[in-house]
Each structure stands twice: as C-alpha cells, then as structure tokens.
C-alpha cells in the first residue's frame, strides 16, 4: 500500500471572523491511499490541520506524515495519538478504500438520500449590522437552532443582538447557542452567563479559556446557563484523560470535533464516556473541505442524533470540491447521484 498527500489552500468566499482573527484562507492536507499495483483506485481523506488549534500544527505534522508514508509501505503501524487530524484523515482514506473507492465512508439511509441531519445555522463574528443580516438569512432559511460566535464586538451590542432575536422568536420556536471561544474572564463571566440565561439561550461553549479545570468546574456548578466544553477537549488523548476531565469538570455538554480530537475513533470514545456520565454532546465540523465534511456527515448520520449538529454546509470556500451534500431548510442531505470529483482530486499536487 502507498500513501500520498497534497497540501491545499482553501479560500474563503468572504472573510470569516473568529476569536483568532479574520480568516481569508486556510490550509488543509488531502490524503489518498492505494495499492501500487492499481494506483487509479484510491481512497480519499482529509487531514484538516487547524493552525492555532490543532496540537500538531507545526513542523511535526509533515515529519509524522512522512513517517506514516514509510510505515504504510512496509505494513507497519504508526502512533498517531497526538496527531488527531492525521488520524482522522487516515481513517477516512482507509474507509473509502475498503468501501470500494466510491466516497461511501459509512453505509446508512443517509447516503441513499433517505434521511437527513438537522444542523444549526452558524453566524460568524462580524460587526453588528453584518451579524444581524446573517441572522436574518438563517431565520428565513428555516433554521430552528442558530449558533452565534460572540466575543468579537462590544458585549452590550451582543446582548442587543440576542435580544433582537428573542423579541421575534421565543425559546420554544428557536434555540440559540453561543460560543465564546474562551473570550470571557473571571471578572465578567458570571454576570454575562446570567444575562444569557435570562434571554433563554440554550448553552454556551467554552466561556473561559481552556486549561483551568478548577475554574471551569466552578462555573459548571454555579452557572444558570448550561456550559459546553470545546477547546478543553483538545490534547486529551487517552481514555483516562478524557474520563478525568468529565468527572472533574462535569460539563452539561461536550462539543466533538473529530479533526481536533482523534478522528472517528477518538470522538467515539468521548461519546461512550459522555453517555456513561449523562453528559450531552453534539458533533461539529472544523473548517474542513467538502472531502472531510462529507466523511464527517456520513459518520454523524449513523449516530442517531436527536439534536441539531454543528456541521458545515460546504458553502464557505470558493475553491472547494464538488460534494453530494446539500441543504434543505435546516436539514443536511446527501444526493447519491453526486460524488466527489476524483479527476479533480487526481490533479492535485501529490507528494510522495
């Protein structure tokens, strides 16, 4: 067997505001695995490394990738525990290859166009007027759950924005989730959590920065608003580390990003532990291209989820790959008549 990789720069249709600044492009790494006796038949995956978040987002990534290539040639396993995006990309490529190289990563009614996945409508950070415009677009499209990235503009403006939504839609009709990306501090977090709870917000992701478990546990104990851990999960590699986090902090929810926590296998371990401890969860994409997003959605469709998931829609980038995924209202669907364009993938800058 052989493994090749192709670095690829995804270009945003419009600047995307995040807690880490404004993004205009994002690097990713496409993988393909094949039998050298039949190189035209290959399994495809994506290692969607995320600078600033992925624990392996430095020179180690490409050194580990070359080690992985060498080991695959001789049939030797590679320890990818601390390289979650590579783990996820390799899992995808192997599943595609063993499934016949048709872009089917998980067999389910979803890939036959018979079921769909409810997702939240993500509203990116921006100035007040732009965010209100984006909210209106999501509401008119039929979303029943929206997620707001907060922490980029003045707090009073963010409160005004949420109040604007609540004045039109009560909590029974529209669920509002917010993601602070660690943007609050201990001087302001408690009154802000109370204000959000008073406005009927469903939950908040990562109100303070990751890495202070005692403070986060305190917040989870006293907050009137359910707290979901996000960045806090990154870097917890073993089952014991994951279990300790859930038992120490006791969050209401965890947010699972397979690209950042070890792929299908790493995320499934979190799910199993969360279910054992009565912790809620949902799955979120992490700026993957349509290759990774397709592979992620197919897995989520097998989980029998009952709440809105945080999956992307493939509409962020101008140079993305063709995808069988499409949106109807707030439901992500799969068109079995469309598959990833393997000729376009074959034309990438592949490296040995």
Predicted features and spans:
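N-terminal capping/lid subdomain adjacent to the active-site entrance of alpha/beta enzymes
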Residues: 1-176, 181-183, 197, 322-352
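General beta-strand structural signal in soluble alpha/beta enzymes
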Residues: 4-5, 45, 148, 176-178, ...
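Shared catalytic-loop signature of beta/alpha-barrel
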Residues: 63, 215-217, 222-226, 231-338
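N-terminal active-site wall of soluble small-molecule enzyme domains
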Residues: 107-108, 174, 178-198, 211-222
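Short, well-ordered coil/turn segments that N-cap beta-strands
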Residues: 113-119, 142-144, 171-174, 200-202, ...
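Catalytic beta/alpha-barrel core
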Residues: 124, 146-155, 177-182, 200-212, ...
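Short, acidic/polar
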Residues: 126-138, 187-191, 237-247
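Active-site-adjacent beta->alpha loops and helix N-cap segments on the catalytic face
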Residues: 128-129, 152-168, 184-188, 208-221, ...
């Amino acid at each position: 067997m052989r493994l090749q990789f192709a670095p690829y720069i995804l270009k945003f249709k419009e600047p995307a505001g995040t807690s880490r600044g404004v993004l205009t492009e994002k690097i990713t790494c496409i993988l393909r695995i094949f039998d050298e006796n039949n190189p035209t038949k290959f399994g495809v995956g994506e290692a969607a490394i995320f600078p600033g978040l992925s624990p392996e987002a430095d020179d180690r990534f490409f050194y580990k990738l070359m080690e992985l290539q060498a080991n695959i040639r001789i049939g030797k396993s590679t320890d990818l525990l601390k390289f979650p995006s590579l783990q996820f990309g390799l899992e995808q490529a192997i599943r595609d290859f063993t499934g016949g190289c048709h872009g089917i990563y998980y067999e389910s009614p979803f890939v036959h166009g018979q079921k769909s996945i409810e997702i939240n409508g993500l509203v990116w950070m921006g100035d007040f007027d732009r965010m209100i415009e984006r909210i209106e677009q999501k509401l008119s499209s039929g979303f029943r759950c929206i997620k707001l990235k907060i922490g980029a503009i003045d707090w009073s403006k963010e409160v005004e924005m949420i109040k604007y939504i609540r004045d039109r839609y009560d909590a029974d009709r529209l669920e509002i989730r917010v993601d602070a990306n660690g943007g609050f501090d201990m001087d302001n977090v408690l009154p802000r959590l109370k204000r959000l709870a008073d406005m009927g917000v469903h939950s908040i992701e990562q109100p303070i920065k990751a890495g202070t478990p005692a403070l986060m546990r305190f917040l989870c104990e006293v907050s009137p608003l359910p707290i979901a851990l996000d960045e806090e999960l990154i870097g917890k590699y073993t089952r014991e580390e994951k279990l300790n986090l859930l038992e120490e902090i006791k969050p209401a929810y965890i947010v699972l990003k397979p690209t950042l926590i070890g792929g299908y296998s790493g995320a499934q371990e979190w799910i199993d532990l969360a279910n054992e401890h009565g912790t809620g969860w949902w799955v979120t994409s992490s700026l993957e291209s349509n290759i990774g997003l397709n592979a992620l959605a197919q897995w989520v469709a097998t989980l029998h989820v009952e709440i809105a998931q945080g999956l992307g829609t493939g509409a962020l980038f101008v140079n993305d790959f063709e995808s069988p995924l499409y949106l109807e209202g707030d439901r992500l669907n799969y068109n079995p008549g469309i598959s990833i364009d393997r000729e376009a993938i074959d034309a990438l800058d592949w490296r040995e």
